[in-house]
Curated annotation (Swiss-Prot):
TM annotation in the entry: none
Gene name of the encoded protein: TBCEL
Function: Acts as a regulator of tubulin stability.
Pfam families, per database record: LRR_9 (PF14580), Ubiquitin_2 (PF14560)
Modified residues (Phosphoserine): S18, S41
Organism: Homo sapiens
Occurrences of domain Ubiquitin-like (ranges): 334-424
Parts forming coiled coils: 349-375
GO cellular component, one term: cytoskeleton
Name of this chain's protein: Tubulin-specific chaperone cofactor E-like protein
Domain LRRCT: 262-303
Length: 424
C-alpha cells in the first residue's frame, strides 16, 4: 500500500524532539536508544522523548516507519495529535498500535469522517482510557466500534461533531465515567436519555451548548437511567421551566450542577438565580463551580420561603411546603435603608453658647468652618473644631484636616461640635 503524501508522525517526532530542538535531559532512563538506522535517516542516535507527546497542528497525514515508532514511543502514555490532517484510521492505528503504554489520545480536528474505522484498526486502541474526538465529525458507527474495542475507556470527548441524534450500540459501555458532548445539536430529551442507556456508570455528563429544551422523563425512570451521575452541566441549554430543575432531584447521586445561561433564569437577578436554584436542589453541594456551604443553603431556603409567601397556594412549588415544614412560616424581611445619611442635627458649642443646627455631611471641614463663621464670629483661620460622639466612650476628636469630609467622622443626629479660638 502506498504511503499517503504529507508529513509523517515519525518525521515530525524527530524534528520536534531532536537534540538540537529539545535539550537532552541527563539521568538514567531519560534518553531513548534507537537502533542503527539506514544512512540518511533523519533520526539521531538518542532522542529526549517525554512520556507526554504534543504534536498538534503539525500537518501530519500518516504514521511513517512503524519500527521506528515502536523504538521511540515504548514509554509514551499521552499523545496529542489534534488539528492535523489525519483522515485514514489505518494510519492512526499504525501509530497507536506501536505505543503500548498509551492511555490518553487526542485526535480532535482531524478529518477522520472521511474513512471507515474497521474492527482490526479499532483493536489497536484497546489500552486507551481517555479519548478526545472533538470536531472530528466521527459517526456514531465509529464511536460504537471504538467502544467495543476499548474495555477500559473512562473519559470520552465528542464535542463539536454536529450530532442531532444519538445512536445506541447493541452493547453498553460500563467503564465510561465522564462524557463531554458539548456544542452539538441535541435538543430532544429522547436523545439524551440514550446516553444513560449507553453509559450506565456515567459519573459526569457535560451537555453545555446543546439547547436541550426540556427534561421529559418520569422521576423513577430518571433514577434508573443515570443511577451513578454525580455531576451534570446544562450550561446554555434551552431549559425554560422550574419543573426541569426539580427533575434533577431524581438523580440519586447528583452533587454538582452547572446551569448558567438558560432561558428560565434570565428574568431573575444574580442573587435570585442562585438562591432559588439552591433551595430547589437540596442534595447539590456545588452550583456553577462554587461550593454551597451550610450557611448559604439555609439563607437560600429561607429566601425561597419568603419569595413565595404571597404567591397563591395553587401556584406554590412543592418544595415550598417541604421548607415550611423545616423552618415554619417566615415573615418578609424588613426593608432597611442602608444609604448613608446626608445631613445631621448637631449641637454647636462655643464659649457658653449652644446652638442646634443642621449640617450637610457631604461637605468638608473647611466648608463647615465657613458655615459656622457667622455664628461664632471667628475667622476660619482662627477656628478649632472638635467632634464629640455622644455614644462613644472617648473624648472629643479634633477636626484638624480641612479637606476631610464630614461623613467620614460618622456624625449622627444628637452629636456635638465644639468650637474654640486659637488665640484665647
Amino acid at each position: 500500500m502506498d504511503q499517503p503524501s504529507g508529513r509523517s508522525f515519525m518525521q515530525v517526532l524527530c524534528e520536534k524532539y531532536s537534540p538540537e530542538n529539545f535539550p537532552y535531559r541527563r539521568g538514567p532512563g531519560m534518553g531513548v536508544h534507537v537502533p542503527a538506522t539506514p544512512q540518511g535517516s533523519p533520526m539521531k542516535d538518542r532522542l529526549n522523548l517525554p512520556s507526554v507527546l504534543v504534536l498538534n497542528s503539525c500537518g501530519i497525514t500518516c504514521a511513517g516507519d512503524e519500527k521506528e515508532i515502536a523504538a521511540f514511543c515504548a514509554h509514551v502514555s499521552e499523545l496529542d495529535l489534534s488539528d492535523n490532517k489525519l483522515e485514514d484510521w489505518h494510519e492512526v492505528s499504525k501509530i497507536v498500535s506501536n505505543v503500548p503504554q498509551l492511555e490518553f489520545l487526542n485526535l480532535s480536528s482531524n478529518p477522520l469522517n472521511l474513512s471507515v474505522l474497521e474492527r482490526t484498526c479499532a483493536g489497536s486502541f484497546s489500552g486507551v482510557r481517555k479519548l478526545v474526538l472533538n470536531n472530528s465529525k466521527a459517526s456514531w458507527e465509529t464511536v460504537h466500534m471504538i467502544l467495543q474495542e476499548l474495555p477500559d475507556l473512562e473519559e470520552l470527548f465528542l464535542c463539536l461533531n454536529d450530532y442531532e441524534t444519538v445512536s445506541c450500540p447493541s452493547i453498553c459501555c460500563h467503564s465510561l465515567k465522564l462524557l463531554h458532548i458539548t456544542d452539538n445539536n441535541l435538543q430532544d430529551w429522547t436523545e439524551i436519555r440514550k446516553l444513560g442507556v449507553m453509559f450506565p456508570s456515567l459519573d459526569t455528563l457535560v451537555l453545555a451548548n446543546n439547547h436541550l429544551n426540556a427534561i421529559e422523563e418520569p422521576d423513577d425512570s430518571l433514577a434508573r437511567l443515570f443511577p451513578n451521575l454525580r455531576s451534570i452541566s446544562l450550561h446554555k441549554s434551552g431549559l425554560q421551566s422550574w419543573e426541569d430543575i426539580d427533575k434533577l432531584n431524581s438523580f440519586p447521586k447528583l452533587e454538582e450542577v452547572r446551569l448558567l445561561g438558560i432561558p428560565l433564569l434570565q428574568p431573575y437577578t444574580t442573587e435570585e438565580r442562585r438562591k432559588l436554584v439552591i433551595a430547589r436542589l437540596p442534595s447539590v453541594s456545588k452550583l456553577n463551580g462554587s461550593v454551597v456551604t451550610d450557611g448559604e443553603r439555609e439563607d437560600s431556603e429561607r429566601f425561597f420561603i419568603r419569595y413565595y409567601v404571597d404567591v397563591p397556594q395553587e401556584e406554590v412549588p412543592f418544595r415550598y411546603h417541604e421548607l415550611i415544614t423545616k423552618y415554619g412560616k417566615l415573615e418578609p424581611l424588613a426593608e432597611v435603608d442602608l444609604r448613608p445619611q446626608s445631613s445631621a442635627k448637631v449641637e454647636v458649642h462655643f464659649n457658653d453658647q449652644v446652638e442646634e443646627m443642621s449640617i450637610r455631611l457631604d461637605q468638608t471641614v473647611a466648608e463647615l468652618k465657613k458655615q459656622l463663621k457667622t455664628l461664632v464670629q471667628l475667622p476660619t483661620s482662627n477656628m478649632l473644631l472638635y467632634y464629640f460622639d455622644h455614644e462613644a466612650p472617648f473624648g472629643p476628636e479634633e477636626m484638624k484636616y480641612s479637606s476631610r469630609a464630614l461623613h467620614s467622622f460618622g456624625i449622627r443626629d444628637g452629636d456635638k461640635i465644639y468650637v474654640e479660638s486659637k488665640t484665647k
